[in-house]
């Protein structure tokens, strides 16, 4: 399930360089994180929905690849993003 337009715009404005910055790595990771968090609630209710679980695993994998890329290119931006999203404990 995708996010609403308002939720997407809020994430883009919060993590992007400007209101139209949808392609930066930080925005992509933040959008994937929001979708993953939304799907986790779905799976609490629908435990046997394996078709959607495959999509969730694909999103997690894509987020991991983007985070690896960001860590390789700019460690400072990577650590800031991880702290803002609360991905590492």
UniProtKB/Swiss-Prot annotation:
The gene is rpsO. One of its GO terms (biological process) is translation. InterPro entries: Ribosomal_uS15, Ribosomal_uS15_bac-type, uS15_NS1_RNA-bd_sf. The keyword RNA-binding applies. This is Small ribosomal subunit protein uS15. The keyword Oxidoreductase does not apply. NCBIfam families: S15_bact. Part of the 30S ribosomal subunit. Forms a bridge to the 50S subunit in the 70S ribosome, contacting the 23S rRNA. One of the primary rRNA binding proteins, it binds directly to 16S rRNA where it helps nucleate assembly of the platform of the 30S subunit by binding and bridging several RNA helices of the 16S rRNA. Forms an intersubunit bridge (bridge B4) with the 23S rRNA of the 50S subunit in the ribosome. GO terms for cellular component: cytosolic small ribosomal subunit. Keywords: Ribonucleoprotein, Ribosomal protein, RNA-binding, rRNA-binding. PROSITE patterns: RIBOSOMAL_S15.
